[in-house]
A protein has these predicted regions:
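Short glycine/serine/threonine-rich phosphate/pyrophosphate-binding segments
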Residues: 24, 123-129, 146, 171, ...
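Mobile "lid/hinge" segments at catalytic clefts and subdomain interfaces of large enzymes
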Residues: 142-281
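Gly/Lys-enriched N-terminal cap/neck module of very large, oligomeric protein machines
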Residues: 19, 25, 29, 110, ...
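Small-residue-enriched alpha-helical segments and adjacent helix-cap loops
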Residues: 72, 76-78, 88, 92, ...
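Glycine-rich, flexible beta-strand/loop modules in the N-terminal catalytic cores of phosphate-handling
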Residues: 25-109, 115-122, 208, 219, ...
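Alpha/propeptide regions of enzymes that mature by internal proteolysis
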Residues: 2-5, 9-12, 26, 54-55, ...
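Ordered, soluble secondary-structure elements with a strong preference for glycine-centered loop motifs
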Residues: 15, 79-88, 121-126, 199, ...
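Extended amphipathic alpha-helical scaffolds
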Residues: 1-45, 249-394
Length: 400
């Protein structure tokens, strides 16, 4: 049975329809604002926990070109790999929702957001995060908070929540903030691209150009403005979604950690060996030496009698290593491999090492190396790409 929640927020009518599609998912919702429609689903494998100390969360944000009544550009008329915007939006959703999972939640979880219909006046990034939050909050996963995202623009010294493209064209700020009703979880800000700058008059260009240099008070004011909007939105969501929420599944939260007795044993008996490995060896040699020290410890009577796993011993060695490195920096003013706090490894640069490339160089500093190759081509060789809410095709001329 589906359930519909409808309300007005920030001057726009929002509709969330739960349980209409993707009924086998732990949580699903069709979210609609204007002509924009996104499907968000949450699936978690409660019977397949991982053994590592992290939350196995995967987020996928996918745009379908049919959402804008278009066919994919190029020779292949099917969606290909994710665009930069899809990848970045997936990360935005991940960074915003990952903190909601309780510590010790080790069950593989996938959040998928698919854009089914697009509206150029609706911010798909904000809508997608809010839809993913709705699916997660009303699912049977142990999530107790609502999170949403808002974009803040600044036009004529006034702030706007989720501005339209027309308003953004005159904005001196593009700030995206995500959070719950009582805390901020993610902040992202970007400047207006140079291609957008040249299309406006000189007065607007000056304002936009000056956005690259924003004083701290203005930014704090914008964040506070966003925080107030987030509080209002999350209170609205939590109240509206209450009747649509499923009963929470009682999952076992796994406690990871090393017994203090093991750490104390290594700290008391092997600190000198670990410190010598840190001070005298290069990075790769240091890792090998620390693993050898852990093997010696694992054969010690203290570890064999208590049947302590090697992975736990090696993790305890790493904890003691971090303590020693910090003590060396704070008290002895030296870093790993014996360098002082102001010592910098020499850098070597070799140029034109690839005969057929237009330009190439090899940077080497310590064990870190970077091979950089440049290729110059004509204007027709740029990468064509399309934005879902824009009918025109754009050209990327600088690619890294």
């Amino acid at each position: 049975m589906s359930m519909v929640c409808e309300f007005e927020l920030n001057g726009k009518q929002e509709i969330f329809e739960f349980g209409k599609v993707a009924k086998q998912a732990n949580g699903s919702v069709l979210a609609k604002i204007g002509n924009a429609v996104v499907l968000a689903t949450v699936v978690s494998e409660f019977d397949n926990p991982v053994s590592e100390d992290f939350t196995p969360l995967t987020v996928q944000y996918v745009e379908k070109t049919y959402a804008a009544a278009k066919l994919p550009g190029g020779f292949i008329k099917r969606e290909g790999k994710l665009s930069d915007f899809e990848t970045l939006t997936s990360r935005v959703i991940d960074r915003s929702l990952r903190p909601l999972f309780p510590k010790g939640y080790v069950y593989p979880t996938t959040i998928t957001v698919i854009v089914l219909s697009a509206d150029k006046n609706v911010d798909l990034q904000a809508l997608s995060l809010n839809a993913a939050n709705a699916a997660l909050y009303t699912s049977n996963l142990p999530i107790k908070k609502s999170v949403c995202g808002v974009r803040v623009g600044r036009v004529e010294d006034g702030y706007i929540i989720n501005p339209t493209p027309e308003e953004m064209s005159n904005s001196t700020l593009d700030l995206y903030v995500a959070g719950s009703k009582d805390e901020l979880l993610m902040i992202e800000m970007k400047t207006i691209s140079s291609s957008q700058m040249v299309e406006v008059d000189i007065e607007a260009f000056t304002k936009i150009h000056n956005a690259n240099e924003m004083n701290e008070d203005t930014l704090v004011e914008a964040i506070e403005f966003a925080q107030n909007a987030l509080k209002e939105a999350n209170l609205t969501y939590e109240k509206a979604f209450e009747t649509a929420s499923k009963e929470k599944f009682q999952v076992e939260l796994v406690e990871f950690g090393i017994e203090e007795s093991i750490i104390n044993y290594i700290r008391d008996n092997f600190s000198n060996e670990i410190k010598e490995a840190i001070k005298k060896l290069a990075k790769s040699e240091r890792a090998t030496q620390l693993k050898d020290i852990a093997k010696v410890i694992s054969k010690n009577d203290h570890c064999t009698m208590n049947e302590i796993e090697f992975s736990k011993i090696y993790e305890a060695v790493s904890i003691v290593k971090r303590e020693i490195v910090r003590d060396m920096i704070v008290n002895e003013k030296i870093r790993a491999d014996g360098r002082g706090l102001k010592d910098v490894r020499p850098i070597s640069i070799e140029t034109n090492i690839l005969p057929s490339a237009h330009s190439s160089c090899l940077f080497t500093r310590g064990e870190t190396q970077a091979l950089v190759v440049g290729t110059i081509a004509g204007p027709k060789d740029g990468q064509m790409y399309e934005v879902l809410t824009d009918k025109s095709t754009s050209m990327e001329r600088f690619m890294v």
